[in-house]
């Protein structure tokens, strides 16, 4: 078996095939495993390639990942909303009951608005099968239909979701957003102490045959047969588990539109906040969709005595670094002018677009011994990537046994 691509989908596919007693070779064009889940270590700072979080409530994560070994560092179950009158903290009342009164009195979540928001989100806590049944619509249409409006929508929900979805136009599938809301309600997002790259590295470490790095696939032919920069590889089956654009170029699969994010990683002597909350801008008067002091949750992300702050915008963007610093200064109430840029990541293809109607289980068998896996075949998430990899592997195994 040959798996092309050592992202989460490819690695979980290879592990599933291996568990079924099959010999697997994983080819990866890059210099490390992970695909879009990578971490750059620069002068002692751990900068994930784009701000990413791991939600331990994902069923596939609980099933396939050794979570204790990742030494997860959790963010708080809430969000800090920067506004003209300062910053207001709005938390999950089930896990941070002390914030209930503050949330209600803040003006962001009046009782009627809370009731409407709860009614809109209610399907997220029911069976997933029921959540996925029925017609779909855009996020904007679903919020309008549910009467979710006011400051809770404009200053919290929409700014928060813009960073999660890599989109602020409300066009994302409402079903997909509710799936994400479900994961947020059931778990607290975190990062591994060694960076997000620790997740794919853990999966790759279980493979009996090491991933072959630096091998670019140039063609996939009937047989099936894979041509790479190192030569020709015959196989009983080939699973293409690359990014969607690459997959669309080498096999017969339609590549979805991809959405981008830009993340600045800043180093500072002092933390502008001492809690481990994600911060959004309720005023929405700048390019930053979210920011966080990574080292308040994960001190290992920076050298001792130093702080690491991420700031994320949509991409592409014409916003300058100066505009980002000005907005961060307003959001934190402390000057960001002297912060040092460790690195800036422009992720042009951060997430596949998830337009309605949501297609959560797209075909993985392309015929002639060719298969495809990736979050673009399931849902645009770590959960979707892991599930897709296993689904493709099971399909391969069934075909070989049949």
Q: Where are these predicted regions, by residue range?
A:
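Short beta-strand to alpha-helix junction loop
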Residues: 52-59, 131-137, 146, 182-204
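Helical element adjacent to the flavin cofactor pocket in flavoenzyme catalytic cores
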Residues: 178-229, 233-234
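Mid-domain catalytic core of redox enzymes
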Residues: 218-322, 331
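N-terminal Rossmann-like FAD-binding beta1-loop-alpha1 element of flavoenzymes
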Residues: 1-26
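Mobile amphipathic helical/loop "lid" adjacent to a hydrophobic cofactor/ligand pocket
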Residues: 61-62, 66, 70-170, 185-186
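Glycine-rich active-site loop/strand segments that organize a redox cofactor
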Residues: 38-57, 118-132
């Amino acid at each position: 078996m040959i798996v092309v691509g050592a992202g989460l989908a490819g690695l979980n596919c290879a592990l599933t095939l291996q568990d079924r007693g099959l010999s697997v070779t994983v080819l990866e064009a890059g210099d490390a495993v992970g695909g879009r889940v990578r971490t750059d270590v620069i002068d002692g700072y751990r900068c994930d390639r784009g701000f990413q979080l791991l939600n331990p409530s994902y069923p596939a994560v609980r099933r396939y990942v050794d979570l204790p070994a990742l030494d997860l560092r959790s963010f708080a179950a809430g969000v800090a909303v920067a506004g003209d009158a300062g910053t207001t903290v709005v938390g999950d009342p089930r896990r941070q009951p002390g914030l209930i009164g503050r949330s209600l009195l803040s003006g962001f979540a009046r009782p009627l608005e809370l009731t409407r928001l709860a009614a809109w989100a209610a399907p997220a806590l029911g069976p997933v099968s029921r959540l996925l049944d029925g017609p779909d619509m855009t996020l904007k249409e679903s919020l309008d239909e549910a009467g979710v409006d006011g400051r809770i929508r404009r200053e919290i929900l929409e700014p928060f979701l813009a960073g999660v979805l890599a989109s602020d136009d409300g066009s994302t599938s409402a079903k997909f957003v509710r799936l994400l809301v479900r994961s947020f309600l059931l778990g607290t997002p975190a990062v591994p102490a060694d960076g997000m790259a620790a997740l794919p590295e853990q999966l790759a470490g279980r493979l009996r045959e090491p991933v072959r790095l630096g091998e670019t696939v140039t063609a996939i032919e009937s047989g099936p047969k894979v041509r790479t920069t190192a030569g020709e590889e015959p196989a009983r089956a080939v699973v293409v588990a690359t990014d969607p654009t690459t997959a669309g170029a080498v096999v017969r699969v339609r590549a979805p539109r991809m959405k981008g994010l830009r993340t600045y990683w800043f180093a500072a002597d002092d933390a502008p906040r001492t809690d481990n909350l994600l911060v959004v801008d309720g005023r929405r008067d700048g390019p930053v969709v979210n920011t966080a002091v990574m080292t308040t949750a994960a001190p290992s992300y920076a050298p001792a005595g130093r702080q690491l702050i991420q700031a994320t915008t949509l991409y592409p963007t014409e916003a300058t670094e100066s505009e980002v610093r000005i907005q961060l200064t307003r959001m934190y109430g402390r000057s960001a002018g002297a912060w040092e840029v460790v690195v800036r990541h422009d992720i042009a293809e951060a997430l596949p677009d998830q337009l309605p109607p949501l297609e959560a289980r797209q075909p993985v068998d392309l015929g002639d011994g060719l298969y495809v896996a990736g979050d673009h075949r399931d849902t645009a998430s770590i959960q979707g990537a892991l599930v897709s990899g296993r689904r493709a592997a099971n399909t391969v195994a069934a075909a070989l046994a049949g």
